[in-house]
Amino acid sequence: MRKYYSLYGRLLDKQRLHEAFRHVKRAKGAAGIDGQSLSAFAENLDAELSRLLLELKEKRYQPQPVKRVVIAKAGGGERKLGVPTVRDRVVQQTLRCILEPIFDPGFHPSSYGYRKGRSCHHAISKAQLFIRRYDRRWVVDMDLSKCFDTLNHDLIIEQFREKVTDGSILHLLRSFLESGVMIGVEYEKSSVGSPQGGVISPLIANVYLDQFDQHMKNRGHRIIRYADDILILCESESGARHARSVATVYLEETLKLTVNMKKTHIAHSSAGVKFLGVDIHTGFTRIQEQKVKTFKAKVKQITSRNTGSNLDGVIRELNPVLRGFVNYFRIANCKGVMKALMRWIRHRLRAIQMKQWKKPSRLHRRLRQLGYKPPFKWIKMRSWRNAASPLAHYAVPNSWLHDEQGLMDMAGVDVGFSVSVI
């Protein structure tokens, strides 16, 4: 195994720091505990990078604690994020660019999370392949409790030391791990974990969990991992139970992680295997119901009839949400779901337009402009039911919403495809 001795000098390059900032800026993100935004950092970019470079050269650089941010999970519960300052993100990104090419080529081939050229679609397609072509239809869905928050610092450094012997790099890596967390005005030490939200945390997690990947491979088990989402695909139920036992022992005893046995399941693909937002069945893949509910909640928020925006503005805000949803879930067999969702969305948009017209006379004028002849039925303009009436469809036809207003049509996107397995 090749060892890397002198890497710290690669950090001491202003151009590298500048490229790292460009990456951090593209990723966006909130300010850390110092309150400095990306735009404020950019205003004094040369001075900020010069100061960082000097601190790194003199080895005076010390990361600041991350800012605790709590966000709600779609399925309930909370996710704790740690937001580093902009300057710390720049150093982390530079460090990541140095270390990633050293470790990534050796990762398990079925590891897909946070790796260049790999995606959720590749992971799902690999699971489909194992289930449908290789008859590995008994699947263990491993659930790790607070994986990122419980990574053992000594084991992290030990893993990096296998290839990196530069003490200054390892010291810098540990300083990020031990920088602590600010929860409001209270400081909390960080004796374990690598906070979600850190630029280098995904690489740390992949290096850490690759030990598990390789252990399972050496034992003859087929796995697919995306970050801390793990599937073990087996030929029989007894094989799945054995694989679960092997995995649990290694994860808990060697890697010091906690397997949530209540959420770790063994399932046959005929009943559906939950993975990365989809249910993978023996013959088809569908979107998980919770993901559809979360999507509809977002659409409802944008298309509230109490919105102050006109229909043009609503559609402009809505389109990126529709595009993101269908682009992710197009790997599923979801043509019917997309058609039903578009009918529901158009109904909501018609309800907005009807309410903004306020008076039936405006509706009737619109119908006459489109060539319809009176008399027209007098209807309540604020009624949700009437937004589905024939008059509403005549006045606000599908073609007008899509062709003239530019509403993205999820039902018009090809779905049910698989990407090439890598």
PLM regions with names:
Residues 1-47:
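N-terminal alpha-helical targeting/anchoring segments
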Residues 178, 254-323:
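A conserved non-catalytic segment of reverse transcriptases
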Residues 48, 55-70, 74, 106-272:
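Conserved polymerase palm-domain catalytic core
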Residues 348, 357-422:
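Extended C-terminal regions of large enzymes
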Residues 111, 189-193, 300-315, 324-337, ...:
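Short, solvent-exposed helix-loop connector elements
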Residues 12-17, 65-69, 74, 177, ...:
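Core structural elements
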Residues 264-271, 317-321, 338-346, 361-370:
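A glycine-rich phosphate-binding loop feature that marks nucleotide/adenosyl-phosphate handling sites
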Residues 87-91, 138:
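Duplex nucleic acid-engaging cores and interfaces of nucleic-acid transaction enzymes
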